[in-house]
């Protein structure tokens, strides 16, 4: 086992300052002036309590268990559970959807399901950035009657999808001892630390929390924050908890990459952020330029106030786009006398939007991080639903450097609601 890690100071990248590159129109004055996501009614479907006990003939099937050994042992693809659910529903064609990093295992899983369930399988090769990309619409158009969505949590409830859905989190076992010793080395006894990660590492987070709280040598108090309806300790790139800066002294993200961690860094700029990479076992101190991000976003909001025609984009990558949010935005924009052009796009690219010459600005109902991370690269403002409502003076952006990251919270814009952000001004 490698020695425990002291945090490495990640060098801040030297990049040109981001700025909004579009130009404000000249000589134009500013004008004065719930239900679940597209629920499909299916009276024949009963959502109720089900028995969770997988039959012994599946669990103890020697041939099946040998086939499962072809998959990595530290990745839990829940093959027994999947087979049981497919057999129960008597489905004939099953769609398998997973992020690109897991596609290497897709054909093994496909062969196992075809052999032990006597079904046809279709591996969906389009990108799957998150649970919002679950593509039950495409699966149904391919005559699938069941879809297995891997590596993401149940962001889109199973009672509103067009076909039967099974979410497989693909939890990953990691070296907990190394993580525990790393935390103990870098923090004082009794420190309160927020710990979170993607759903793959959720069991690890809760296991490490219990072990450190009961550590007789150097107890630590780990707090897995929760933004309902997400699980405790789960974070998304667009949704994270607002932490109590008076008590939480640091936050630790378990996972590779920074995308999901940045959500919490944007939402909690006052709290030091650390990242533990379970693959390289490196522990690093992470930084985010909040001021630059908020300056760029405020500039885009300010520029959009001059717009007379706005392109309202509905994301068509899986279930990224929420038609209810789109309708609310269209109504609010129209009330201000702004002409609305509705656009459907699976992926929102600068060169694509540049073709809409007569549109002054865009509002996208797809992924808020697209605007936050890449909005500066578009030649016209590209606002999130939150930013559009701020521009229309129907939501709040505080003077302090806190930007809300609650898109898929229970009252978030991603669910067709308008959240309360009045606390940002206090």
Swiss-Prot record:
**Chain positions recorded as [4Fe-4S] cluster binding sites:** 132, 238, 367
Q: Which reaction does it catalyse?
A: L-histidyl-[translation elongation factor 2] + S-adenosyl-L-methionine = 2-[(3S)-amino-3-carboxypropyl]-L-histidyl-[translation elongation factor 2] + S-methyl-5'-thioadenosine + H(+)
Q: What is its EC number?
A: 2.5.1.108
Query: What broad class of enzyme is this?
Result: transferase
Disulfide bridges in this chain: none
GO BP terms in the entry: protein histidyl modification to diphthamide
* Cofactor notes: Binds 1 [4Fe-4S] cluster per subunit. The cluster is coordinated with 3 cysteines and an exchangeable S-adenosyl-L-methionine.
Pfam families in the cross-refs:
Diphthamide_syn
Q: Which domain of life is it from?
A: Eukaryota
Entry's Gene Ontology cellular component terms = 2-(3-amino-3-carboxypropyl)histidine synthase complex; cytoplasm
Location (main, coarse)? cytoplasm
The protein's GO terms of the molecular function aspect are: 2-(3-amino-3-carboxypropyl)histidine synthase activity; 4 iron, 4 sulfur cluster binding; metal ion binding
Question: Which keywords label this protein?
Answer: Cytoplasm, Iron, Iron-sulfur, Metal-binding, S-adenosyl-L-methionine, Transferase
Necessary cofactors: [4Fe-4S] cluster
Q: PANTHER family per the record?
A: 2-(3-AMINO-3-CARBOXYPROPYL)HISTIDINE SYNTHASE SUBUNIT 1, DIPHTHAMIDE BIOSYNTHESIS PROTEIN
Q: Relate the protein's function as given in its record.
A: Catalyzes the first step of diphthamide biosynthesis, a post-translational modification of histidine which occurs in elongation factor 2. DPH1 and DPH2 transfer a 3-amino-3-carboxypropyl (ACP) group from S-adenosyl-L-methionine (SAM) to a histidine residue, the reaction is assisted by a reduction system comprising DPH3 and a NADH-dependent reductase, predominantly CBR1.
Describe its partners and assembly state: Component of the 2-(3-amino-3-carboxypropyl)histidine synthase complex composed of DPH1, DPH2, DPH3 and a NADH-dependent reductase, predominantly CBR1.
What family does the Swiss-Prot or TrEMBL record give for this protein?
Belongs to the DPH1/DPH2 family. DPH1 subfamily.
Q: What is this protein called?
A: 2-(3-amino-3-carboxypropyl)histidine synthase subunit 1
Q: Please tell me the species this chain comes from.
A: Candida albicans (strain SC5314 / ATCC MYA-2876)
């Amino acid at each position: 086992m490698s020695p425990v890690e002291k945090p490495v100071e990640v060098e801040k990248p030297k990049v040109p300052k981001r700025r909004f590159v579009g130009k404000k129109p000249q000589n134009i004055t500013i004008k004065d002036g719930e239900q679940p996501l597209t629920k499909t009614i299916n009276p024949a479907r009963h959502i109720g309590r089900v028995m969770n006990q997988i039959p012994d003939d599946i669990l103890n099937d020697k041939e099946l268990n040998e086939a499962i050994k072809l998959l990595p042992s530290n990745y839990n693809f829940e093959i027994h559970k999947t087979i049981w659910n497919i057999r129960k529903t008597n489905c004939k064609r099953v769609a398998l959807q997973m992020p690109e990093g897991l596609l290497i295992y897709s054909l093994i899983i496909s062969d196992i399901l075809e052999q032990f369930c006597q079904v046809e399988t279709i591996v969906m090769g389009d990108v799957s950035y998150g649970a919002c990309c679950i593509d039950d619409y495409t699966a149904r158009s391919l005559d699938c009657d069941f879809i297995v969505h891997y590596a993401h949590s149940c962001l889109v409830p199973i009672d509103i999808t067009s076909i039967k859905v099974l979410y497989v989190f693909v939890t990953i076992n990691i070296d907990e001892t190394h993580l525990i010793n790393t935390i103990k080395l870098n923090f004082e006894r009794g420190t309160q630390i927020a710990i979170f990660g993607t759903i793959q590492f959720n069991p690890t987070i809760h296991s490490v929390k219990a072990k450190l709280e009961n550590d007789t040598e150097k107890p630590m108090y780990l707090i897995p924050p929760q933004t309902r309806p997400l699980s405790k300790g789960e974070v998304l790139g667009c949704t994270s908890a607002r932490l109590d800066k008076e008590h939480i002294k640091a936050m630790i993200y378990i996972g590779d990459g920074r995308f999901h961690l940045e959500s919490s860094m944007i939402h909690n700029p006052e709290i030091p952020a650390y990242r533990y990479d379970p693959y390289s076992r490196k522990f690093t101190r992470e930084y985010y330029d909040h001021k630059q991000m908020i300056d760029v976003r405020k500039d885009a909001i300010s520029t959009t106030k001059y717009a007379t025609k706005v392109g309202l984009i509905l994301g068509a990558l899986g279930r990224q786009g929420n038609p209810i949010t789109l309708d609310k935005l269209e109504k609010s924009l129209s009330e201000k006398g702004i002409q609305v052009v509705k656009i459907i796009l699976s992926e929102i690219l600068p060169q694509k939007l540049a073709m809409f010459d007569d549109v002054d600005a865009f509002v996208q109902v797809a992924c808020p991080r697209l605007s936050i991370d890449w909005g500066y690269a578009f030649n016209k403002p590209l606002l999130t639903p939150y930013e559009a409502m701020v521009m229309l003076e129907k939501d709040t952006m505080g003077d302090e450097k806190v930007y809300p990251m609650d898109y898929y919270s229970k009252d978030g814009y991603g669910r067709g609601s308008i959240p309360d952000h009045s606390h940002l001004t206090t």
